[in-house]
């Protein structure tokens, strides 16, 4: 979030935010402390045209853990840069007593970066120590079962991996926005999410938005009390209420 001061005006730019993540508890206290006497509030409006249920990340982790306990081989499609979702996946794997793996250097490096920067401040929540999945040790890994968190860029590796796993014991937890594989315009721009899902016989969607819902947006406006509010990242005709 940014406070911009110029020509005697104070502008508060929120960027993306939400209240239903692990860091959401700091949203309102931060605004009350710093977002005072604001002339213009620039707030995200991604969810203004959606009525998605925004469950808390804790619930996301709980649902994932239940799936991880039910299936021996679990692959999770998630963003490498979503620190809170990665924490949910890590905690779910711990609850299910399964080892967490990655299969790309980028996913591994982002987890390492998050650990170095945020582990201590988050009391271990954002501390990650995944193992790298390697095909030369696959038989040993298969015996114990695993959780593999990956992105669409690894589709060729995942396709190769699936040939070695029994279909009935393998599942994909799709942990991204459903619009990527449902909305024709989104598929036309980037078909990789749909193609990735279609590799699997068993698929379950477990996700919550990375953006503020309408209730949270209204609460932010009520706390900041700006003279003017500008919504960004929204559909053209979307309104708060």
Residue ranges and their predicted role:
Residues 91, 95-97, 125-241:
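C-terminal regulatory/interaction regions
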Residues 1-95, 99-103, 109-110, 116-124:
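His/Asp/Glu-rich metal-coordinating catalytic cores
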Residues 115-118, 219-221:
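Short low-complexity, flexible loop/linker segments enriched in glycine and/or proline
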């Amino acid at each position: 979030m940014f406070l911009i001061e110029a020509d005697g005006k104070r502008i508060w730019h929120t960027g993306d935010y939400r209240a239903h993540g692990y860091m959401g508890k700091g949203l309102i206290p931060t605004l009350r402390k710093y977002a005072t006497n604001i002339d213009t509030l620039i707030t995200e409006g991604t969810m203004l045209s959606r009525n998605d249920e925004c469950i808390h990340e804790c619930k996301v982790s709980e649902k994932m853990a239940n799936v991880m306990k039910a299936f021996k081989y679990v692959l999770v499609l998630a963003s490498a840069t979503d620190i809170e979702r990665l924490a949910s996946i890590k905690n779910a794997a711990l609850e299910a007593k399964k080892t967490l793996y990655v299969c790309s250097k980028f996913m591994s490096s982002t987890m390492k970066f998050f650990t170095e920067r945020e582990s201590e401040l988050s009391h271990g929540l954002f501390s990650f120590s995944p193992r790298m999945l390697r095909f030369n040790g696959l038989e040993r890994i298969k015996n114990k079962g695993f959780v593999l968190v990956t992105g669409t860029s690894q589709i060729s590796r995942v396709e190769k991996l699936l040939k070695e796993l029994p279909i009935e014991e393998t599942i994909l937890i799709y942990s991204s926005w459903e619009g990527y594989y449902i909305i024709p315009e989104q598929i036309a721009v980037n078909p990789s999410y749909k193609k990735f899902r279609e590799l699997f016989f068993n698929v379950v969607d477990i996700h919550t938005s990375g953006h503020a819902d309408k209730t949270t947006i209204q609460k932010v406006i009520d706390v900041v009390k700006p003279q003017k509010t500008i919504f960004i990242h929204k559909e053209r005709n979307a309104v708060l209420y």
